[in-house]
A protein has these predicted regions:
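Cell-envelope/extracellular polymer assembly enzymes that use nucleotide-activated donors
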Residues: 5-7, 38, 184
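Short, well-formed alpha-helical segments that are part of the catalytic scaffolds
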Residues: 15-30
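Donor nucleotide-sugar binding loop of glycosyltransferases
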Residues: 15-18, 46, 73, 99
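Conserved donor nucleotide-binding strand/loop of the catalytic core
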Residues: 36-40, 51-83
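A conserved acidic beta->alpha catalytic loop
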Residues: 43-51, 96
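Acceptor/aglycone-binding surface of glycosyltransferases and processive sugar-polymer synthases
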Residues: 67-83, 88, 100-179, 206-215, ...
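Catalytic donor-sugar/metal-binding loop of nucleotide-sugar-dependent glycosyltransferases
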Residues: 151, 175-177, 186-203
């Protein structure tokens, strides 16, 4: 296995209530489980003092990028990918609904693929969401599979491991700044010939999550945009 050198990237929007606990837990784990690491928080124009809290409480222990205005999860992660200094990047949601220890399952597959994605819906995965969110998520996943990229149980899981050079290659072609960036990147990975592994993980439901019903409508619009971009030839041609 390669050395465990990792950027752990948290996109954050109005996460002042829980970001400190997330970072404390992640730092404690990283100190004992990684050879080299950096924790990177990209504040996406928060209005609740998230960035100030991170800077004041963690100082040099955590790298902080402040975006002046909200651009969307995809835009925030792109900023983090551009700034990452380690050869692998783990994307994780700021609520740590997927325990950081689940990284071990992804890392075990890193020798076989430059992209390893966690999956709440794959056989062996655990999804502790309310029934309505499970239903809407499953419906959306079917639409994504039929319209953009197939073969995955869960494109939207926020826990993903990318080799940094591959992530940067994909983000050069990224056009979606919202939640749809997840399946856009996987579609690009397929077109550019990068292997992707999907690993079942355990996802806990955290109160106060930031995904609203409106977000599902936004994702629907992003699916339409990606289909339009494909028709207009705005993505790289698929490699044979």
């Amino acid at each position: 296995m390669p050395r465990r050198e990792l950027t752990i990237l948290f996109p954050a929007y109005n996460e002042a209530r829980r970001i400190a606990d997330t970072l404390e837990e992640t730092l404690a784990w990283a100190r004992t489980h990684l050879d080299e690491y950096e924790i990177l928080v990209v504040d996406d124009g928060s209005t609740d003092g998230t960035a100030d809290l991170v800077a004041a409480r963690f100082g040099a222990q955590v790298r902080l990028i402040r975006r002046a205005r909200r651009g969307g999860k995809g835009a925030a992660i792109r900023s983090g990918v551009e700034a990452a200094s380690r050869p692998w990047i783990l994307f994780s949601d700021a609520d740590l609904s997927i325990p950081i220890e689940e990284f071990e399952k992804l890392w075990a597959e890193a020798v076989t693929a430059p992209i390893v994605i966690g999956s709440k819906r794959a056989p062996g995965g655990r999804l502790e969401y309310p029934a309505l969110r499970r239903f809407l998520g499953g419906l959306g996943q079917q639409l994504i599979a039929r319209s953009v990229v197939s073969g995955f149980h869960d494109t939207q899981c926020g826990f993903k491991l990318y080799r940094t050079d591959v992530a940067r290659e994909l983000f050069r072609h990224q056009r979606i700044d919202g939640f749809g960036f997840d399946f856009e990147l996987l579609m690009l990975a397929r077109r550019l010939g990068h292997a992707v592994r999907e690993v079942p993980i355990h996802c806990e439901h955290k109160l106060g999550g930031s995904v609203s019903p409106r977000a599902y409508l936004t994702v629907l619009g992003e699916i339409v945009r990606i289909r339009w971009n494909l028709l207009r030839g705005r993505y790289p041609r698929a490699r044979s």
